[in-house]
Every structure is written in C-alpha cells, then in structure tokens.
C-alpha cells in the first residue's frame, strides 16, 4: 500500500467544485408493495426528468460512453429487472440517482440493502388498498437510518378509499406523521385534480398516458372558476381543506429530514398526474448526500463528510451472472466522499490491499454506460471477480469501514441436498463463498449441516444456478422447519455455555462465526427469550460485525 498515502480528514474547507457537485445530487429509492404502481412511477419520473421521450426510448447522459453487452438476454431468461435497478438523469440543474427496489419474485435481501444506499425514499401507496405488508417491511428498513420519506398515494383515477382513512392508516400502521401537501378532488370517474395546500392552487386532472404535460392551474381555493368547473365537488373540497388546516400537521422540513413526518401527495402515475410535484419535492426538500458514520478502529468511529476530497464508499449489492460467458459479477458501490475518476487506485480496506478502479459503470434504464467521473451520492458498478463482498469499503488510503449495511433475519430457510454425495466439499466451498459475498445467508448447525436463509424465494433459485455454473454442484433445496433466526449476544462465557448446552441443535453459526438462534416458531422464540432475559436476540447485524 506504499503508493497510496493514508488520507486524513482535512481541516481546510471542502474543494468548492466538489462541494457544488455534491449539493446537486439527489439519491433516492422507491418503495411499495407489488402492484401499487412503482414501476409506472419510475418510468414517469424518467419521462418528466427528460431521460426518456416516450415509454421505452432512453437517453443516456451526454458525457457517457456506451459499453455494449448481451446481459439483457440473461435478464429475460431470469425474469429479473436488473438493468433498471439504478438510473441516473439530469433534471433542473440536479443529478438524480433513482434506485429501484425489486418487488414480486425479485424480492430478496438486495431489496432491503438498496435502501442503505439512498438519502431519501418515495413511498407509493395504492389508494384502493392502503398500507400493505411489503411496504411495512421496507419502511422498517428506512427507519434504521431515519431516511426521509415522501408519500405518493397513487391510482386516484380509480374507485379508492377515503383520503382521511388512508392518512390515518399510514400514521397508525407505519408510525409516521402525515402532512398533506396536495389533496384530491373526487376519485375514480369523478377525479378532477388536486388542491396544493402550500401554494393555494388547484391542478386540474386530464387523463393522458404518453407524453409529459403541464396540468392546468387555477389559483386560489375561493376562486369562482372552481364553482363553474367542479360544482358538485368544490363544496366538499373546501370543507376537507378547512378540516386539514385545522387538524393535520403542517409540513415541517426538520421533521421530514429526521424521518418523523412524511409529506403526502395524491395523483395518478399512469396519467402523469402528480409526478412533477414529487420531482419538485425531491429537489426542494430531499437532502443532498449526507455524512456517513464509518469505523476507524474497533471502538472508534467518525463522520465522513460527502465533500471531503479523499474518495470512499461501500458495496451494497452484488449482481452475478449478468454475462454468463464471463461469469460477470457487478458490485454496486455507493460513493460517500471525494471524486471517482477512471483508473484511480484505491485501498480495499478488508483485504488491506490496493486495487485499480477502471471501466466502472453507471446505469441508465436499459443501458450500461462507462462512468467518467462521479461524486458522493452516485452509484457505480465495479466488475467483480470475487474480491468484493457486500459491506466492503474502498478508500484512497484511510482505514475506514462504513456502518449501517445490515444482514436481516431471513424469512425462508432451506437445507441443501446433493444429487452427487461426492461433491460435498465443492458444496461447502460454494456456500461459504456465496455466503461471504452476501448472495445468501449460510448457517452451520451442530454436526456440520448447512442451512440457507433468504428473504425471497428468488435467492434460492439464483444460488442453485450459481452452484451449478460456478462450482459444478447440482443441489436441491428442501424447505427447513425454521421460523426465524436471531443473532445472539451473551453477557458472559458461562451464560453462553449454558445456553448452548440447553438449546443444542437450535444454535448455529453464521458465515462470520457469530452464534445464531434458529427458532422453530414464534412461540418457541418468545419462550426462549423469556427464559434467557440476559441474552440479546437481534433481528439484524452489521456486515463484518463480530458479536460477543
């Protein structure tokens, strides 16, 4: 590592150009339950951002050079929308990084981890269905870092639930205050538009799916034009607005940035209605890249500022088999400070060695594009031949380790069974390496049995395919009778020994050697926790963390 001097945080002001570029960044994710309209909203944000002209036609940034690849065919076979998982576009003098959180059968631990790389989130709620299970899980992940959340209540052009009921449900179920910014006028066939509470104007709804269009604006809720246009709806609108102004929380930027309050917008993504207001809110209210906590020693941490000159960041996702001919793996890397430039040398902190960053990628919908330069908030794709794991930190010399990239307790468990028993060593090696990479969680039980944990069925399918392709191991995954896993922290060695003696096969070890309790049911977990009050049972743990 002699070539790279250790970087220390500078006491001098931040480089002005770097600071300006960082302030222009907005990096956010979209969270929703499947079918709430996330994919549609993503496309419409790109449409309003000028990144696409019509559905399916994509423009990359002018400065980008194209890298050709046949990975799209792999995606079609797999049914995974990987290429659109990170999208960058320019809008109103800002650089927007939009990170997708895959849903449906694509749901995996990656869905959670993506949220560790954003500075804000847009939560999409189906106005007919309200808060749904996957939204609850994703919001819990946002809460780990108090991520600011903007809410978009979608599909107002359909028959939906009462707006006050939806706000109440969001507040009660998600435990976050709502501050309505726009308010709907009617719904379904009588959806007329929204009233903007902060700007005292009505945006009139006109259906139209294809091109971006400006909504017609009527100034003032007392405007007589409203009585002419919406004679049946205007009375109810004025009553509801009086109610909101008297009873609901006014918007507080401080509470929003602290993750305590969500501004709420109503609209119809498929009709481009309400999308521009979301984009504007991201520019006006969502934070630019934020300082990040990084460990500098086992006991000590420091706050890394995004406009510090030395480059640093962390890997939050690894996507394998993008190109089967090359065993192509891409490590998705969030830049946290400094500036990326092609060909730069960096320190791989976990391995303690130098590596060169060349041909890093950025993403624009269906295209991978070679990255020329990037700053905090940007996401780059690094070609990875197994040297990078989820949670790894790269720096320009400083021994940093970014915090806040968690493992989550799996919700599905399987045991691997070999078709060829002579391949057990290859299976063990494959599972160990895939576990270290973060593709799946691997637990070793008493007697050496390997148990796999995932948050989505797709993870098992991808691992089975990779075992076959990369390790020549044909394995069948059979469902295991495990309800959940909890990482254990013991107060002392005596308690540890007594617990392990009593629980026996229920105690396993994860890929880093940390003790884990494998509960067979919720009742089993609750009884065990009650019996051992001094033992910590944790649903998450940090990547690379060694528990006592």
UniProtKB/Swiss-Prot annotation:
Cellular component aspect of the GO annotation: cytosol
Binding site for GTP: 32-39, 100-104, 154-157
Gene Ontology biological process terms in this record: regulation of translational termination
Disulfide-bond pairs as recorded: none
Localization annotation: Cytoplasm
PROSITE patterns tied to this protein: G_TR_1 (PS00301), G_TR_2 (PS51722)
UniProt KW Acyltransferase keyword: no
Boundaries of every tr-type G domain copy: 23-290
Primary role: Increases the formation of ribosomal termination complexes and stimulates activities of RF-1 and RF-2. It binds guanine nucleotides and has strong preference for UGA stop codons. It may interact directly with the ribosome. The stimulation of RF-1 and RF-2 is significantly reduced by GTP and GDP, but not by GMP.
PANTHER family: PEPTIDE CHAIN RELEASE FACTOR RF3 (PTHR43556:SF2)
Protein name in UniProt: Peptide chain release factor 3
Gene: prfC
């Amino acid at each position: 590592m002699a070539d790279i001097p250790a970087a220390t945080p500078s006491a001098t002001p931040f480089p002005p150009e770097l600071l300006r570029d960082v302030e222009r960044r907005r990096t956010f994710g979209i969270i929703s339950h499947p079918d709430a309209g996330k994919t549609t909203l993503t496309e419409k944000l790109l449409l309003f951002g000028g990144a696409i002209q019509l559905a399916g036609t994509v423009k990359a940034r002018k400065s980008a050079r194209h890298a050709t690849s046949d990975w799209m065919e792999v995606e079609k076979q797999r049914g995974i929308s990987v290429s659109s998982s990170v999208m960058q576009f320019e809008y109103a003098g800002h650089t927007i990084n939009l990170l997708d959180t895959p849903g449906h059968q694509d749901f995996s631990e990656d869905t959670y981890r993506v949220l560790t790389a954003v500075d804000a989130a847009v939560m999409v709620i189906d106005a007919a269905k309200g808060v749904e299970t996957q939204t609850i899980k994703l919001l819990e992940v946002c809460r780990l870092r108090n991520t600011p959340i903007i809410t978009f209540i979608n599909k107002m052009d359909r028959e939906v639930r009462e707006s006050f009921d939806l706000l109440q449900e969001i507040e009660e179920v998600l435990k976050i205050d709502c501050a309505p910014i726009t308010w709907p006028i009617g719904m379904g066939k009588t959806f007329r538009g929204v009233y903007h509470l902060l700007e005292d104007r009505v945006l009139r709804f006109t259906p139209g799916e294809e091109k971006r269009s400006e909504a017609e604006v009527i100034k003032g809720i007392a405007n007589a034009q409203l009585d002419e246009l919406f004679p049946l709806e205007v009375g109810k609108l004025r009553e509801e607005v009086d109610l909101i102004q008297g009873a609901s929380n006014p918007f507080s930027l401080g509470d929003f940035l602290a993750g305590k309050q969500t501004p709420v917008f109503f609209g119809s993504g498929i009709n481009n209605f309400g999308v521009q207001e979301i984009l504007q809110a991201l520019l006006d209210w969502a934070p630019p890249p934020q300082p990040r906590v990084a460990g500098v020693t086992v006991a000590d941490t420091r706050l890394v500022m995004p406009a510090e000159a030395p480059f640093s960041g962390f890997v939050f996702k690894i996507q394998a088999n993008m190109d089967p001919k090359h065993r192509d793996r891409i490590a998705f890397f969030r830049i946290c400070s400094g500036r990326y430039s092609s060909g730069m040398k960096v320190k791989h902190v976990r391995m303690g060695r130098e590596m060169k960053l060349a041909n890093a990628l950025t993403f624009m919908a269906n295209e991978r594009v070679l990255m020329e330069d990037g700053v905090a908030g940007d996401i780059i794709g690094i070609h990875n031949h197994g040297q990078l794991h989820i949670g790894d930190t790269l720096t320009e010399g400083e021994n940093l380790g970014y915090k806040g990239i968690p493992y989550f307790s799996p919700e599905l468990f399987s045991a691997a069974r070999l078709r060829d028993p002579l391949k057990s060593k290859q299976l063990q090696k494959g599972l160990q390496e895939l576990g270290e990479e973060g593709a799946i969680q691997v637990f070793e039980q008493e007697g050496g049995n390997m148990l796999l944990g995932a948050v989505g069925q797709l993870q098992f399918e991808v691992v089975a395919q990779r075992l076959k392709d990369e390790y020549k191991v044909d394995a069948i995954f059979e469902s295991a009778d495990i309800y959940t896993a909890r990482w254990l922290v013991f107060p002392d060695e005596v308690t540890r020994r007594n617990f392990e003696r009593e629980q026996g096969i229920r105690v396993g070890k994860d890929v880093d050697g940390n003790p884990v309790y494998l509960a067979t049911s919720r009742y089993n977990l609750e009884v065990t926790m009650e019996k051992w009050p001094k033992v910590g049972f944790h649903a998450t743990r940090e990547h690379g963390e060694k528990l006592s």
